[in-house]
UniProtKB/Swiss-Prot annotation:
This is Glycine--tRNA ligase. The lineage of its organism: Bacteria, Bacillati, Actinomycetota, Actinomycetes, Kitasatosporales. Belongs to the class-II aminoacyl-tRNA synthetase family. Its main location: cytoplasm. GO terms for molecular function: ATP binding; glycine-tRNA ligase activity; protein dimerization activity. The gene is glyQS. Gene3D superfamilies: Anticodon-binding domain (3.40.50.800), Bira Bifunctional Protein, Domain 2 (3.30.930.10). Substrate binds at R99, E162, F209, E210, Q211, M212, E213, E321, P322, A323, A324, G325. It comes from Streptomyces avermitilis (strain ATCC 31267 / DSM 46492 / JCM 5070 / NBRC 14893 / NCIMB 12804 / NRRL 8165 / MA-4680).
Length: 460
């Protein structure tokens, strides 16, 4: 993977309407992004596939949608108010601020060893001066706000840094109303917020982001088995949607870097190839033990244990948590799908072609309907076909420009099929279907086109 591929994806994303800089007419908001028409579709397709795989295709997982702003007591009990912080350091030469642990991790990735003298051995990524960092101080990752007409200590509230706590506080109600018993899971997708010191790398690290999380409640003693199970399931989900295994790996957090609630955390890392860092976290699968349920039970005075009727005993479930970010998944799928090859133009000359070889289930547009020209007979027929196909899939109608250029536009946004309505259509009532990756073309009767596409767009 080329080192400048991220820049290529950023350019493509803006040019084709996947992702735009936030508030760009005012100069932009740092590390904040808006998702355009194609980006919204890609995001929704990723979320839809996650929900199908993790929830609706299983009998042991149910869903929930909890509030973004929870009671302040939730974050006190969970340990976030006391411990959700990062080590902040500043370069005394250029006054750029960094997370100290990120500087050390980048050093380790480059030199295959830890800096012997800590920050004193590290050059500033901005100005290049060595060892000019201040002593790290803890910086809270919580974003706070005030509720109500007054702004005092009693009105402080927090925007959730994770969706998980809304699941834990609803555990007993969901378990009872859904009539589930461990092992079972509760899943949630939604926005979370973290006051990142050094956001960046496009949509990889932002202060506002969307999560896909599931908390799987199991009997203590069975947690390690279930963590291995969900690690394999999450790996399979990514590879099943097209990520290549050579661009993925597992990273087990060392004991000294585990979160305050974790017994073990393993990350799926992807070869993002950011400047200085080849690998980046794609998704984490954590064993949170009974930390959260026990903490909330103690703080609230409510019983969050489970009575096992078969065993005749009561216990507090352990929790296995696969937690993914929609933005990071989207970036990985875009990077993995991006290909440059060659294809003949109208004159038979080979030209460079850019293709997003996205799995059709993720492709923002499933089918493009293209009349050969803006002919008064062809256009109405093509528009009628597009209207009929929209009952099933997201369809794009395009009649502007040469047909070869329109094919290239669709290749670049990942559309798996182009359907061309030409002058022969008026006689034989058939259309030409072009497949994105192979560029092979096939003639299909109009009365069979829906079935033809449906057989190739299963799961879309």
């Amino acid at each position: 993977m080329a080192a400048d591929k991220i820049d290529t994806i950023v350019s493509l994303s803006k040019r084709r309407g996947f992702v735009f800089p936030c508030s760009e007419i005012y100069g932009g908001q740092k590390a904040a992004w808006d998702y355009g028409p194609l980006g919204v579709e890609l995001k929704e397709n990723i979320k839809r596939q996650w929900w199908r795989y993790m929830v609706t295709s299983r009998e042991d997982v149910v869903g929930i949608d909890s509030s973004v702003i929870l009671a302040t007591e939730v974050w006190v009990a969970s340990g976030h108010v006391a411990t959700f912080s990062d080590p902040l350091t500043e370069c005394t030469s250029c006054h750029k601020r960094y997370r100290a642990d990120h500087l050390e991790e980048a050093y380790e990735a480059k030199h295959n060893r830890s800096p012997e003298n800590g920050l004193a051995d590290i050059n500033c990524p901005n100005c290049g001066n060595k060892g000019q960092f201040t002593e790290p101080k803890q910086f809270s990752g919580l974003l706070s706000t005030h509720l109500g007409p007054t702004q005092d200590s009693g009105s402080v509230a927090y925007l959730r840094p994770e969706t998980a706590q809304g699941i834990f506080t609803n555990f007993a109600q969901v378990q009872q109303t859904s009539r589930r018993k461990p092992p079972f899971g509760i899943a949630q997708m939604g926005k979370s917020f973290r006051n990142e010191i050094t956001p960046g790398n496009f949509i990889f690290r932002t202060r506002e982001f969307e999560q896909m999380e599931m908390e799987f409640f199991v009997k203590p003693g069975e947690d390690e088995k279930w963590q291995e199970f969900w690690m394999q399931e999450r790996w399979n989900w990514y590879t099943g949607l097209g990520l290549r295994e050579e661009n993925m790996r597992w990273y087990d957090h060392p004991a000294e870097k585990l979160s305050h609630y974790s017994k073990r955390t393993a990350d799926i890392e992807y070869r993002f190839q950011f400047g200085g860092n080849e690998w980046g976290e794609l998704e984490g699968v954590a064993n949170r033990t009974d930390y959260d349920l026990s903490a909330h039970a103690k703080a609230s005075g409510q019983d969050l244990s489970y009575f096992d009727q078969e065993a005749g005993e009561r216990w507090t479930p352990y929790v296995i948590e696969p937690a993914a970010g929609v933005g990071r998944a989207m970036l990985a799928f875009l990077l993995d799908a991006y290909v440059e090859d060659e294809a003949p133009n109208a004159k038979g000359k080979m030209e460079k072609r850019t293709v997003l070889r996205l799995d059709p289930r993720l492709s923002p547009v499933k089918v493009a309907v293209l009349p050969l020209s803006r002919n008064p007979e062809l256009s109405p027929k093509a528009k009628g076909l597009a209207t009929a196909l929209r009952q099933h899939w997201n369809i794009e109608f395009d009649d502007a420009g040469a047909i070869g250029r329109r094919y290239r536009r669709q290749d670049e946004i990942g559309t798996p099929f182009c359907v061309t309505v030409d002058f022969d259509t008026l006689d034989d009532n058939a259309v030409t279907v072009r497949e994105r990756d192979s560029m092979k073309q096939e003639r299909v009767s109009l009365d069979q086109i829906e079935g033809y596409l449906a057989a190739r767009l299963i799961g879309c």
